[in-house]
Regions:
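ATP-binding N-terminal substructure of ATP-dependent carboxylate-amine bond-forming enzymes
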Residues: 1-106, 137, 321-325, 374-387, ...
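A conserved helix-loop-beta module that forms one wall/lid of the active-site cleft
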Residues: 94-164, 171
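Conserved ATP-binding module of the ATP-grasp superfamily
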Residues: 126-128, 149-154, 168-203, 233-238, ...
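Short beta-strand-to-turn element immediately C-terminal to the catalytic PLP-Schiff-base lysine
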Residues: 133, 165-170, 211-213, 279
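ATP-dependent carboxylate/phosphate-activation module, predominantly the ATP-grasp catalytic core
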Residues: 199-267, 271, 278, 290-318
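A structural supersecondary motif
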Residues: 272, 362-378
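Conserved protein kinase catalytic/activation segment
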Residues: 282-284
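A glycine-rich beta-turn/hairpin centered on an aromatic-Pro dipeptide
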Residues: 323-366
Length: 429
């Protein structure tokens, strides 16, 4: 194997993070992967592309052994590819004394949702009142002391993808959700020893994706998110990329706020994926920020819509910062090349998948760009983004047509999922 010294280290290259290595390889760099633990959740591991790396180093609690392995290379940067990689990437980058290290004092606040909101509060940035506990009675005492009314949100302190999130309308629902969640293992393989409590925010939810370079923050795209509530859990319905030209004032409002968030969390380099609620149409409030790329999207569709994507801009920011600044300077914002709408599939049934889904009717819809659907294993009733059975990405020039197509996809869903679990059809895999 021909190994050069130009090296990028990617920690936890899962989900959309699997495409980081190809982006750097295309620019002449080689990549080493650090697996952030001996055991990785199948939710992540299924997306790992081992062939993109010259080595896969397994971290088992000892940073120094990883540092020793990396010391023979000229490491340009250590980059987290997924949520479970954030803390380890911070630690390795700091110990390698890399100039692209984010503020190590704020590392926990980039992962722990309690510490995150407290960091915003301390910095004077709009935040949500939060409380963490391992006792349900403490929740009720805190709600009373703060004068917080129902509904409230109960969720893990450090998970992702709406995993374990419950919207509770009364004390009984809080107790039920608490009992179901406390001391369980979340979707990322971490223990829910404590839970986070916060008031429910009413408003419109947005995703603000960013890339930072030497403390300068750039918004790559803003996505409006629509969710529905199923059995007290927020479930993704659809998401649409917003035009920075058509929504100029909204872009300015959300961008200015999220940049303050990134400063408060000590993010100077790399990707940011922030979920923001716009309350009363005027006040942005952070739900959470992830210091890694957006997960679970079709990058090719985003490239067609924007002319670039989150991953390509991360690579550009580290290796060609001048061009990166040029592309994302606010005054260079251009209209969308195409409108993008993502439909998240919602299964109302649970069962073993017996048959390949017949997706031809959906694929033949005029604006469908790509279809990603679970085809084996167990089909679960959709309750989180993590057990979402698939998503369909559509591109077009007319928003009304995209929304009509979204509704048509919803009409196909019941038959599609029934067919997948019907053992009498005979198209077994």
């Amino acid at each position: 194997m021909n190994v050069n010294n130009k090296l990028i280290v990617i920690v936890g290259a899962y989900s959309t993070g699997q495409y980081l290595a190809p982006a750097f390889i295309s620019k002449g760099y080689q990549c080493i992967h650090v697996q952030p633990g001996a055991t990785i959740s199948p939710f992540y591991l299924d997306s790992f592309r081992k062939h993109d790396f010259i080595n896969n180093l397994v971290w088992e609690g000892d940073d120094e052994s990883i540092i020793q392995e990396l010391s023979q290379f000229d490491v340009k940067a250590v980059i987290p590819g997924s949520e479970i990689a954030v803390l380890l990437a911070d630690s390795l980058s700091q110990k390698l004394s890399l100039p692209t290290t984010n503020d190590p004092r704020m590392s926990s606040a980039r992962r722990n949702k309690y510490d995150m909101q407290k960091a915003l509060e301390q910095a004077g940035v709009n935040s949500i009142p939060v409380f963490k506990t391992n006792k349900s009675e403490a929740i009720f005492n805190w709600l009373k002391s703060q004068g917080i009314q129902y509904p409230i949100v109960l969720k893990p302190i450090s998970s992702a993808g709406t995993d374990g999130v419950s919207i509770c309308q009364n004390q009984e629902e809080v107790q039920l959700a608490f009992n179901e969640l406390i001391d369980t293992v979340n979707a990322l393989g971490e223990n829910n020893n404590e839970l986070l409590v916060q008031p429910y925010l009413h408003g419109i939810e947005y995703v603000v994706n960013t890339v930072s370079s030497n403390g300068r923050h750039y918004v790559t795209e803003i996505i409006r998110v629509n969710k529905i509530t199923i059995n007290a859990s927020p479930v993704y319905d659809y998401a649409e990329v917003l035009s920075p030209v058509e929504h100029e004032l909204l872009y300015e409002l959300l961008s200015e706020y999220v940049k303050k968030v990134l400063d408060a969390l000590g993010i100077h380099f790399g990707a940011g994926h922030s979920e923001v609620m716009l309350v009363n149409e005027t006040t942005p409030v952070l739900i959470e920020t992830a210091a890694r790329p957006i997960g679970g999207i079709d990058l090719s569709a985003y490239t067609e819509s924007l002319g670039y994507n989150h991953i390509s801009m991360v690579a550009e920011s580290y290796l060609n910062p001048e061009n990166f600044h040029k592309i994302l300077l606010p005054e260079n914002k251009l209209p969308l090349r195409k409108r993008l709408l993502c439909t998240f599939m919602i299964s109302p049934i649970h069962g073993e998948i017996c048959n390949r889904p017949d997706l031809m009717a959906i694929k033949n819809l005029p604006h469908v760009h790509s279809v990603l659907m679970k085809t084996q294993g167990v089909l679960e009733k959709t309750s989180t983004l993590i057990n979402c059975p698939g998503f369909i990405t559509s591109l077009g020039t007319n928003r009304e047509e995209l929304m009509q197509q979204h509704q048509k996809i919803r009409q196909y869903e019941p038959h599609l999922f029934l067919q997948m679990v019907d053992s009498t059809i005979g198209l077994r895999r």
